[in-house]
Curated annotation (Swiss-Prot):
Substrate binds at residues 300-306. This is Adenylosuccinate synthetase. It is found in: Cytoplasm. One of its GO terms (biological process) is 'de novo' AMP biosynthetic process. The lineage of its organism: Bacteria, Pseudomonadati, Pseudomonadota, Gammaproteobacteria, Aeromonadales. The gene is purA. It holds the Pfam family Adenylsucc_synt. GTP binds at residues 13-19, 41-43, 306, 332-334, 415-417. It comes from Tolumonas auensis (strain DSM 9187 / NBRC 110442 / TA 4).
């Protein structure tokens, strides 16, 4: 608990981070996105009205918050402008409260074309990307050929750099993937349309956050996707292209790692995954279908159906280790209502019969393990919207306590519905 708080997903994304960020920003002065792009989909429900944010930090719905998009985020200008316009048409002021790092890499149309062409070429080995150019933009960043927000300050130089990088990428598109080239003239014209707006939002993010810290302002760092999709620590190669873990906060925003005081890990009471990749506890029976239906498990960004399974404490152990989780927020507890029994995966059994309590490092290793479960009685009572832990059925309380015991991490927040007030805060991350 403290002044600087990180909120991130501990599973394969879609854990319910957006709602929790929005809920806790009543005490924050700054909310910072530090990785990912508009492949994220954070769904918020306020007074029954649903808002889906893909790029702008969820704190934008709070008048007291300034929102920052840090250098670790790959920025799609067209997506940003669309989101800004939608928010402003709904009555939320954006332009005077949203700030950008000039080091943000730009996602441009050729990145999207490359992303789609590659997924198509992979066929049945497709990774399951959102097709929004995230990976190719990060590739350009690492290869030091990417264009950044700061390049927009000099359009003559920008045009030269754009010509060079598009010659390179259009060669790939036409000669290797056999698809049409992207028009240089069209891309440059589009950039000129929004360049001045983006420039007007540029600040020195490191300095802004450091001054905020020294004033005693409360700062929240909003993660996107989930720990198990981290480019280094996730189920590689079925991962995203950024560091979704707590270490990404420092590198993706320029904020000193020693100043982070609390890391809140968001976890569903079960597990979901969208797209390809290993998923040891995945259910292919009626229970899995029930979780999908009751949990409305369809991606906020792609609309794809999510795969559903039991809570995986083995994978969670790795998330705790990597992120130094201070406490959990357990979401969608109500989705488990009505089940005769609930299960927690407590180990992975190998082909030789040995049981391990840590996951493999890469996707291939999951082919050799099967989950070992601990079963507990379910509950028939309705927990949707319950606002006090004392009002939960005893079986649900037992399930919560068992997760705490297995993981060694306290559950500080419990969510029983999509709205702000359908939440139990047992220990506030920003509490003094």
């Amino acid at each position: 608990m403290g002044q600087s708080v990180v909120i991130l997903g501990t599973q394969w994304g879609d854990e319910g981070k957006g709602k929790i960020v929005d809920l806790l920003t009543d005490k924050a002065q700054f909310v910072v996105r530090y990785q990912g792009g508009h492949n994220a989909g954070h769904t918020l429900v306020i007074d029954g009205k649903k808002t889906v944010l893909h790029l702008i930090p969820s704190g934008i719905l709070r008048d007291n918050c300034k929102c920052i998009i840090g250098n670790g985020v790959v920025l799609a200008p067209d997506a940003l402008l669309k989101e800004m316009n939608e928010l402003e048409s709904s009555g939320y002021p954006v332009r005077d409260r949203l700030f950008l790092s000039e080091a943000c890499p730009l996602i441009l149309p050729y990145h999207v074309a490359l992303d789609k062409a590659r997924e198509l070429a992979r066929g049945n080995k497709a990774i399951g990307t959102t097709g929004r150019g995230i990976g190719p933009a990060y590739e350009d960043k690492v290869a030091r050929r990417g264009l950044r927000v700061g390049d927009l300050f000099n359009m003559d130089t920008f045009a030269e750099k754009l010509k060079e990088v598009m010659t390179y990428h259009n060669f790939q598109l036409t000669q290797f993937y056999g698809v049409e080239a992207v028009s240089y003239e069209d891309v440059l014209a589009a950039v000129k349309e929004y360049a001045s707006l983006l420039i007007s939002m540029v600040v020195d993010v490191t300095e802004m956050l450091d001054q905020a810290r020294k004033r005693g302002d409360k700062i929240m760092f909003e993660g996107a996707q989930g720990t198990l999709l981290d480019i280094d620590h996730g189920t590689y190669p079925y991962v995203t292209s950024s560091n979704t873990t707590a270490g990404g906060v420092a590198t993706g925003s320029g904020y000193g790692p020693r100043f982070v005081e609390y890391v809140l890990g968001i976890a569903k009471a079960y597990t979901t995954r969208v797209g390809g990749g290993p998923f040891p506890t995945e259910l292919f029976d009626d229970v899995g279908e029930n979780l999908c239906a009751r949990g409305h498990e369809y991606g906020a960004t792609t609309g794809r159906k999510r795969r559903c399974g039991w809570f995986d404490a083995v994978a969670m152990k790795r998330a705790i280790q990597i992120n130094s989780i201070s406490g959990f927020c357990l979401t969608k507890l109500d989705v488990l209502d009505g089940l005769d029994e609930v299960k927690i995966c407590i180990g992975y059994k190998g082909e030789d019969g040995t049981v391990r309590d840590v996951p493999p490092m890469a996707a291939d290793g999951y082919d050799l393990v099967t989950p070992v479960y601990e079963s507990m009685p379910g509950w028939k009572e309705n927990t949707f919207g319950v606002k006090s832990i004392a009002d939960l059925p005893q079986a649900a309380i037992n399930y919560i306590h068992r997760i705490e015991a297995i993981t060694g991490v306290p559950i500080d927040i419990i969510s029983t519905g999509p709205d702000r007030d359908e939440t139990m805060i047992l220990r506030h991350p920003f509490a003094d």
